[in-house]
Amino acid sequence: MKKLFFTTALLGLALAAGAQRIDINNSQNRTEDGFEGWVIGTATQASTTADGITITATIDGTQQGRTLKGEWWKDGVNKYSKLVSDGVGVYGLDASGNTPQLQTGEVGITLTISGLSTGEHSLMAYHNNPSGYNGPKLDVYVGGTLKVQGVEQSNRAQTTTLSGQSYVKFQAQEGQPVVVTYRTTPDPSFDYTQGYNTTSLFINALIFDRPNPLTTASDPTPENTDEHAEVADDNAVTLSWTAAEVARKHHVFVGTAPDALSEVAVTTDASYRLAQANPMNTYYWRIDEEDAAGQTYEGDVWTFRPRRLAFPEAEGYGRFAIGGRGGTVYHVTSLDDDIQNPQPGTFRYGITQVHGPRTIVFDVAGVITLKGRLTCSDKYVTIAGQTAPGRGIMFRGAPFGMQSDGITRFIRMRLGYHNGNVDKGLDGLGMAGNDHAIMDHCSISWTIDEGFSSRNAKNITLQRTLISEALNIADHPNYESGKAHGFAATIGGGELGGLGSSFHHNLLAHNEGRNWSISGGLDGAGAYDGHHDMFNNVCYNWGGRATDGGTHEGQFVANYYKVGPSTTQMALLNAQLEGTGSGTQAYYVSGNIRENLNGSKTQDALNDTYKYTLSGGQKLDWTVFQSEPFFPSYATIETAEQAFQSVLSDVGCNQPELDNHDERMIQETLHGTTSTVGCKSKKKGLIDRETDAEGFEGLNIVDATRPDNWDTDQDGMPDWWEQTMGTNASAADHNDGATELNGYMTNLEQYLDFLAHPHFVAKPNEQIVVDLRPYFAGYTNFEVIDDGERASDGFIYAYEGTTLTARATWAFQQPRVVNVAVRDRQSGNTITRCFYFCLTEAPLPAGIATPTASQPHATGSSALYNLKGQRLSAPNKKGLTIGQGRKFIQK
């Protein structure tokens, strides 16, 4: 079985080969990729050992009233360079333990280095003050001999190239330490006690046995370790760098292993276009610089991975999440949960005990009652809820959170009232702290805190997810008795140097508040942070809060908010300027609609549908509402009215099938109705316990299990699918099949994509009849645009009214795709959805529709299918069809 892993551990091994690299930090969590971390707190001496070399740092000269101290620039670490935005310096130390800046006299740090082999070595150090103080030049001594003088120190440089640097060469004898001292040389004519000045020094990082930075290329693009490198339409990646001062030519080396690079070009330009970059590969590259005399200087090895959409419909800033692509497959075979001793086959085991990139598939359907909060701590995980049989998977009891580069699709979270046990957690699904992650087609309800949270995240997307019926007066332990807290979501995003966060085509129904609560936070400098893109969302029957909160830059575009009987707050967006930070908070508002109780529609109107409020002494000296967007959305944006119909036609966990709760949410939003009343609040639609609605007993989620012969090789793809597609059903080949022609989708990803759309399986000459109305629920009176009969290579399909009929005269190795386009007769709005048809001769296990003996292939037998692509019995004379105990009426 192929495993195409891409991990930072592997990167570290590659980048550290042949050189020791030490990143000096004041926290273990801020080490640059490819470096060994050295955490230094407050002490007169500190030591570390890396790759057999031991380094001890001490204060040079007098130690009285002085101390080593690790320090960091928070904004620099988060936004710019972890390597040079923290380090160790020398500070004063008074009797009370305070550590003031030193502003008089020379200051030095001595490094005693042991373990070096006999011969010539080099040592490069970065000198960048993270505290915002300007320091004097420094000299470097080896064994007491001056080697380099007049090294400039930088102040909060944002890149390694702009940072102060020193470089020395020296001879070492095995068994004897080398002593290197860095000592400042303050200008006697300058008063360092005035302003932000210091006579001290900083060391951020140490790199042994690499060429002088003046002779090597730097500042690579893509950035080193970039796992989402930009790719052109022709799959090319442009490599560029800052040339060394001495360089006249650049030798470009590229490969897919760090120790197997090949020279691909010699150029005088500081760029190279790498053609046909494959997103399944990790690329390593190096630039060797050649000077005017023909001398070449070997550069560092950098690495990147070309980006690719998480799945074909992924949009927004989280669209390039990697997920489990290239990793293993884990099968959930049990609905049990055990916090203390997770068992193989359970979901918790696959999240906490299995490691490395992985795709989690489900061989069971039903309800997983989580006994406690569950958080995925690993990157590169795909949760493929669409693989479950029956009506899919639902979680209850405790929250679940994903990690960076996670892909989460087609799962339900219905938490339920806590009954006094609040320790398990009160929220629903989350992407808190995530970077490059996407959550798609999920359903969340009956939470006690917010249904969804993404605080401190960046580069994320939440799309086509249904958040509904957050329990309103449900005894939240952080609020007084009787307090309403039915919150939909707190959305952080685009923080800590991130580009943005996307929240689009979601349905928020029957939630008292936080529809959304925008949580931009503050950056490391205390300035307002966050970049939020909120578009094409639908909200119905909120209570006292619609969208509020704050962000540095927010886009609120083409959303549709429909007033319900419990709605009291008419403003759709309240930009709350609360005086908690510096800088600005601004918004681009365009194309939104508020549908009022009487059916009238209000367009964007300042101080009506949107407004700002001031508090906390906030001084307003900027324009809050701007006339142009701040950043691109990387998505197709519909009008608000189009979005209303589009979202209601395709939202929530609708694969393998919507449950009756989500069907009710869609219908009540569509028709402006409610069917519940809160037992505490007495508010229509805003429930306080799940028993005010269906309750768990009223949900139509049922247990189901795949047959034993479903997936012989356990690669996530059933045998019938592999036999149809021509892949190997006896050997795991889920990571194969990625080509430029199919968008570099693996075999497994192609199967997951099939399951993510309305899909149907049949034998050749079996006629498939599909009632299209459930797939276009937001279009109450639609017509098919491309009507009539179509035929292509033995595949025939036709429309009659709202019915699609399809048939194939022989089996096909690839599913056939029908793009069904419909038009609303009243609004004129259109939508297109993909329907997949798999026509196969492969044996089909139980659970897949097969023709009966009374319906031979050659007669063109006919079958009616439900939303799961499961065949139902034929309709009777009254148009009534029975399937799995449910009634379907053809009108």
What are these regions (language model features)?
Residues A125, D336-Y349, G356-T382, A388-F395:
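N-terminal extracellular ligand-recognition/capping segment immediately after the signal peptide
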Residues R689-V761:
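Extracellular calcium-associated, cysteine-rich motifs in secreted modular proteins
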Residues R307, V367-E495:
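Right-handed parallel beta-helix
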